[in-house]
Amino acid sequence: MRDMISVASGFQYSVNIGYDLGSDNKLKSFIPTKSALSLLEDILLSVNPTSSDRARVLIGAYGKGKSHIVLTILSILMKRDLTLFEKLMPKIEENPRLYQLIQNYYESENKILPVVISGSNTSLTQAFLLSLQLSLIHISEPTRRVVI
């Protein structure tokens, strides 16, 4: 059986958004689905300063890639180098509207501050404030990596 079935090299078993935010390998290994491309397009449309439709709820079974798509979209919003999205960019290039949205976003002066909220025994408000503080510390000290 092992001769017929094997795990692809580089296959990642899990994604932790806070820990993997700077991981190039996670971005390179993301395999986009039609629904992932649709979500990316929706989010790119929602970052327009005039947009009021910004909230999203992502529901799916364990292991379906929710964290991986969020990590990938967040990395695009952070304007990471597009060459890191090895498997994603060919699919995006097949969709002229999505490709143009990404090009326009990368050429814009829009900036996104990632605030990754981790579960804790504090209130949601406290968890948000702590995560916001850590994100602000991270951007003010570019040589320091803060894992939330």
Task: Give the positions of each predicted feature.
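Conserved catalytic segments around the Walker B and adjacent sensor/switch elements
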Residues: 56-57, 83-90, 101-120
